[in-house]
Amino acid sequence: MEAPAPSLTEEDLTEVKKDALENLRVYLCEKIIAERHFDHLRAKKILSREDTEEISCRTSSRKRAGKLLDYLQENPKGLDTLVESIRREKTQNFLIQKITDEVLKLRNIKLEHLKGLKCSSCEPFAAGATNNLSRSNSDESNFSEKQRPSTVIYHPEGESSTAPFFSTESSLNLPVLEVGRLENSSFSSASLPRPGDPGAPPLPPDLRLEEGGSCGNSSEMFLPLRSRALSRQ
C-alpha cells in the first residue's frame, strides 16, 4: 500500500506565493503600473488609504511597483488579489501566465521537498524499530543468562550446589543421615572386643601390672569373708 502523496498547507501556499513575488520582482516592477490596481486592492482590504499614499510618494514607476509588491508579500491573499486586478484590466494577461507558471514551479519544488523529507523520516523509523527489536531480544537473553546462575551457588572448593530455597530434598534427608550415623556408631562400638576378650590387642606392660595388682588386692579382701564362712560351718 503506497503512502498518500504529501499536500501543501495554507502556510506552505502562502510561502510559495511570497517566493514567487520575490523571484518575479524585477520583471513585475518593469511591467506593473501600481496606480491601476489601487481601487481593487483597497476594495479587497489588501491596501489601506495610507498604504496607497505611501506608494504614491515614490518618485518612479518602478519604485512604486516595488513598494506595492512589498505590501502584497505581507498579505497571504495579496498575489491572488493582484491577479484578479490584472484580469479585470484585460491589458496585461501575459502577466497572469507568468505569475501562474512561477507559482506552479515553486509549488512542485515544495512538494518534492516534503516528499523527500517524508521518505527520509520513514527509513530511520524502520531501522530504529529493528534495532529496538534486536535490543529487546538481547535484553531478554541477557536477563535469562542472569537468572540462570542466580539459582546456583559455589562452594570454596569449586563444587556447585543448588541455592538454599532449592535444597528441600537435602534437608528432608538429614534425619535419615543422622539415624544412619548413630546406628553405625553403635554397631561399631558393640562389635569391638573388650580388653581380655579373644581377638583383643594385648595391653601395655604398665596396664598389665596395674591389673595384676588390683586382682591381688581384691582376692585378699575376699579371703576373710571366706574364712568366716568356713569357720561358722
Swiss-Prot record:
Protein name according to UniProt: B-cell lymphoma/leukemia 10
Domain of life: Eukaryota
Organism: Rattus norvegicus
Signal peptide range: none
Region feature (Disordered): 130-149, 186-233
Lineage of the organism: Eukaryota, Metazoa, Chordata, Craniata, Vertebrata
Domain CARD: 13-101
Job of this protein: Plays a key role in both adaptive and innate immune signaling by bridging CARD domain-containing proteins to immune activation. Acts by channeling adaptive and innate immune signaling downstream of CARD domain-containing proteins CARD9, CARD11 and CARD14 to activate NF-kappa-B and MAP kinase p38 (MAPK11, MAPK12, MAPK13 and/or MAPK14) pathways which stimulate expression of genes encoding pro-inflammatory cytokines and chemokines.
Primary localization class, coarse: cytoplasm
Keywords carried by this UniProt record: Acetylation, Adaptive immunity, Apoptosis, Cytoplasm, Immunity, Innate immunity, Isopeptide bond, Membrane, Phosphoprotein, Tumor suppressor, Ubl conjugation
UniProt modified residues of type Phosphoserine: S138
Biased composition (Polar residues): 130-141
InterPro entries in alphabetical order: BCL10/E10, CARD, CARD_BCL10, DEATH-like_dom_sf
Alphabetical list of Gene3D superfamilies matching this protein: Death Domain, Fas
